[in-house]
């Protein structure tokens, strides 16, 4: 009987996946893809779950489960980043909050930049004030996330109205199937890696896309120096431990650990996430600190996806999330005898 009930559950999930795919191609109007605008500073965002987030961000009400699944499939990317970096994050150092002591140190540095105090500046000459540089979020191994509508990524800027962002998509597939939209510029001394730069996607957000491996860029010092107050790495479903892709990360991970900046990682399933953690433990044992314990992502996609080559392989975008950073060795003083 238990096997039969499990079979029915799988059938229901497969039916849901099929209906969601047909819904996307139905040609209907999608009100769930109309996104909320800037957030009033007096209105606090509640990041307990998807419902409280969408409500406090003043999204149009989403009254059907299917529309909710379609909306979260895109929003999971910026909101996953925002939910970890924000000062009102659902992840904390309290018992069961998953954040470690080292994680609190790293995220506190970024939050200091992302939530600056009011400067009292104005539009005139007398109102000029020094501003912090933008927070750089390096999204490595970028695939589908690099081609998301820019309105989706602007949601990240709305969560931090006083901060500036520079999103940098890096990876050989970061411009896949987008040649008609953005032809790759030639490599020149002023643009040595042929970056596609989208300036002013929002007044506080800039997006760059580079079709290359990160370790190639790192070795040139192109993004040097790195600062834990201004830099963060994001790896969406990187497949660190997957047999087909782990070799592509062997050169990259040691370089990321050198920067001492936080590295956020998501996985399609619990197995996928645990496989990545096992691979990092094997290749960099003793060289990293865990910032956030692995577990289910509060803002995972609610829509399930099916592997066409294996119907038993069911996953969802950003199901799990964890974070780590290169180990920092604090200076110690040896008292003179």
Model-derived segments and spans:
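Domain-level detector for long C-terminal conserved domains
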Residues: 176, 180-337
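Positively charged, amphipathic N-terminal segments that serve as targeting/anchoring signals
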Residues: 5-232, 236
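BZIP DNA-binding basic region
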Residues: 1-2
